[in-house]
């Protein structure tokens, strides 16, 4: 995506311009205006609509394979948690009032459920600006835990010399 181009208008008074020049300039400005309106409707930034010149918008950050897997795992966990709660509620409703083991087994054996889950109803959904790690999104001052050490390896001994 290219940066918006800067248009430099000549400082020519309208008195010095002929009628044909003014008509040509008007047509050019109308076409530029139309193009800019279409760009704004498509979601593009318009440099002339802001009074302060803005810095160019950086391209979206590429997603690494690890970040992708983390996001998939988080989404799956949230949806599974939501589904588990809904399934439990439906199972409890279907066996409500059952008093014997045979009745319970018969109902559970023939039970068919259909549930719908979505990320809108999932708890702990981060907003777009928050980090992907739960610790980052909940407490910005939290520190990371130390990496686990293998039990088979001996810890390195550090000697401090004066």
Curated annotation (Swiss-Prot):
Record has DNA-binding as a keyword: yes
Coiled coil: 12-43
GO molecular function: DNA binding; identical protein binding
Skewed-composition ranges (Basic and acidic residues): 151-162
Keyword annotations of the record: Coiled coil, DNA-binding, Host cytoplasm, Host-virus interaction, Inhibition of host innate immune response by virus, Late protein, Viral immunoevasion, Virion, Virion tegument
SUPFAM superfamilies: BLRF2-like
GO CC list: host cell cytoplasm; viral tegument
Pfam families attached to this UniProt entry: Herpes_BLRF2
Localisation per UniProt entry: Virion tegument; Host cytoplasm
Subunit structure: Homooligomer; homooligomerizes and binds double-stranded DNA (dsDNA) cooperatively. Interacts with host CGAS.
Function field: Plays a role in the inhibition of host innate immune system by targeting the CGAS enzymatic activity which is the principal cytosolic DNA sensor that detects invading viral DNA. Acts by inhibiting CGAS-DNA phase separation: directly binds double-stranded DNA (dsDNA) in a length dependent but sequence independent manner and is able to form DNA-induced phase separation in infected cells. DNA phase separation of ORF52 mediates disruption of liquid-like droplets in which CGAS is activated, thereby preventing CGAS activity.
Protein name: Tegument protein BLRF2
Organism classification: Viruses, Duplodnaviria, Heunggongvirae, Peploviricota, Herviviricetes
């Amino acid at each position: 995506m290219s940066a918006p181009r800067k248009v430099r208008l000549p400082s020519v008074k309208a008195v010095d311009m002929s009628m044909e020049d003014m008509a040509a300039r008007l047509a050019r400005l109308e076409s530029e205006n139309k193009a800019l309106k279409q760009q704004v409707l498509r979601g593009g930034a318009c440099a002339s609509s802001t009074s302060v010149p803005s810095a160019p918008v950086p391209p979206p950050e590429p997603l690494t394979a690890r970040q992708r897997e983390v996001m998939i795992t988080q989404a799956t966990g949230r949806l599974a948690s939501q589904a588990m709660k809904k399934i439990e509620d439906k199972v409890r409703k279907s066996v409500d009032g059952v008093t014997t083991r045979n009745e319970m087994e018969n109902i559970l054996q023939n039970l068919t459920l259909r549930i719908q889950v979505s990320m809108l109803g999932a708890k702990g959904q981060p907003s777009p600006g928050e980090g992907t790690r739960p610790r980052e999104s909940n407490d910005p001052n939290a520190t990371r835990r130390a990496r686990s050490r293998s039990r088979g390896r001996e810890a390195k001994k550090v000697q401090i010399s004066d």
